[in-house]
Design a protein with these regions (language model features):
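Short, surface-exposed coil-to-beta transition loops
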Residues: 63, 73-77, 92-93, 109-120
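Hydrophobic residues embedded in beta-strands of well-ordered beta-sheets
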Residues: 75-77, 87, 104-107, 117, ...
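Terminal domain-start segments
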Residues: 19-60, 69-71, 164-186
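Acidic/hydrophobic-patterned starts of short beta strands in beta-sheet-rich repeat architectures
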Residues: 60-69, 104-110
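Repeated scaffold domains used in trafficking and secretory/extracellular systems
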Residues: 94-101
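Sec-dependent N-terminal signal peptides
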Residues: 4-14
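Acidic, small-residue rich beta-repeat scaffolds with periodic aromatic anchors
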Residues: 20-27, 109-186
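Beta-propeller blade repeat segments, especially FG-GAP/WD-type strand-to-loop junctions
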Residues: 76-91, 122-125
Length: 186
């Protein structure tokens, strides 16, 4: 009897280990469409199509961040940290911008319209934003030297000068190439 019990113990411990659940994008789809993609497009959520998603670990903590893309006609995409059922937007982009990934950070660089450039960065630790920076610049595209009409820089939600902002961005280092495995959204 003892021999049988000893042989069964390894099998029992295997069956008690937590099984990782497959990721269910549908749990987040409506929130992504209505709170993030739809406002970015200024279209109705019925016209906005999410094409695919990928799970990537930006900060190397073993927890994946969610990267979602719209179809090519819309070209919206967003990167989110996941905390249970809640999402935190880390960066989003449209046809006039791009997502950039750094070691432990993600951001976007955008040409919103002729004469406006925006960029923002989120630095992560344990899948939470620990610091951030934003820049917005508007300039007169009709002037000969494209005179700057507005410049704004923030680091951790505080206005800073251009040098302080540039120091933050330089600490991010170079962008890294990410080739995520994309999964279709049904």
């Amino acid at each position: 009897m003892k021999k049988i019990l000893l042989l069964l113990l390894p099998l029992l411990s295997l069956s008690c280990q937590a099984q990782e659940k497959p990721f269910d994008i549908n749990k987040y789809k409506d929130v992504i469409l209505n709170e993030y993609a739809y406002p970015r497009f200024a279209k109705s959520s019925d016209d906005t199509v999410l094409k695919d998603y990928a799970l990537i670990d930006i900060d190397g903590d073993g927890k994946s961040e969610l990267w979602v893309r719209g179809d090519e006609s819309q070209d919206w995409q967003g990167v989110f940290s996941l905390d249970g059922d809640s999402l935190t937007l880390l960066a989003d982009a449209d046809v006039c911008s791009e997502i950039k990934v750094y070691k432990n950070a993600v951001g976007y660089h955008s040409y919103i319209s002729p004469g406006q450039v925006d960029e923002a960065f989120s630095v992560l630790k344990n899948s939470c934003i620990v610091s951030s920076a934003e820049m917005s610049m508007k300039f007169d595209i009709f002037s000969d030297d494209q005179e700057v009409e507005y410049e704004g820089y923030t680091v951790n939600d505080k206005e800073v000068d251009e040098d302080t902002y540039n120091e933050f961005v330089q600490k991010l280092g170079d962008t890294i190439e990410v080739n995520p495995e994309w999964h279709p959204i049904e």
